Amino acid sequence: MTLEQLIPLIIMAFALGMDAFSVSLGMGMVTLKLRQILYIGMTIGIFHIIMPFIGMVLGRFLSERYGDVANFAGAILLIGLGFYIVYSSILEGEETRTAPIGISLFVFAFGVSIDSFSVGLSLGIYGAETIITILLFGLISMLLAWMGLLLGSHAKNILGTYGEIVGGIILVGFGLYLLFPI
C-alpha cells in the first residue's frame, strides 16, 4: 500500500473516530476509573474493526456483482452518512451521557461504530486493503475514545457537537472525491 493510498484511510479513520471522541468527551465528564477508560476505549476500537470488516466484505460482493452501480452507490452512501452525522449533531446537540457498563457498553460501542459499517461497505466496493483499513479504524477510534474520556475528565465542552460535525463533513468530502476523482 502506497502512502497516497494510506493517507486518505488515516484521515477517514480520524473522521469516523471523531464520533467516538465527541461522545467519549461527554462521557469523560462522569467519574471514571482508569481501568474503565481503558475498557471503554478498547471496546470501541474492537467494534470499529468488526463493523467495517463486515461492511467491506459485503461491499466487495456488491462490487463484483454490480460494478459501476456499486461504485456510485458507495460514494452516495458516504455523502449521505456524512450529511446525516452533521444533521443529527446539529439537531440533537449536547445531551447528558452516563458511563456505559455491561451490555450498555456493547450497545454504546455498536452505536458509535455503525457509521464505520457504511464506510466499510463503500471501501469494500472500491477494493480498499481490508486488514490495514480495519486496523487503522480500530486503533484510531480507540485512541480518540481514550483521548476524549481523558480530556472530558479534565475539561467540559471542548468540542462537543462540533467534533461530530467535522467528522461528518470529512465523510461528505470523501464521498465527493469518490464521485469526482481529481
Swiss-Prot record:
GO terms for molecular function: manganese ion transmembrane transporter activity. Pfam families: Mntp. One of its GO terms (cellular component) is plasma membrane. The keyword Nucleotide-binding does not apply. It is found in: Cell membrane. It comes from the Bacteria. The keyword Transmembrane applies. Its main location: membrane. Keywords: Cell membrane, Ion transport, Manganese, Membrane, Transmembrane, Transmembrane helix, Transport. The chain crosses the membrane at residues 6-26, 37-57, 72-92, 101-121, 131-151, 162-182. It is a multi-pass membrane protein. Probably functions as a manganese efflux pump. PANTHER family: MANGANESE EFFLUX PUMP MNTP-RELATED. Belongs to the MntP (TC 9.B.29) family. This is Putative manganese efflux pump MntP. The lineage of its organism: Bacteria, Bacillati, Bacillota, Bacilli, Bacillales.
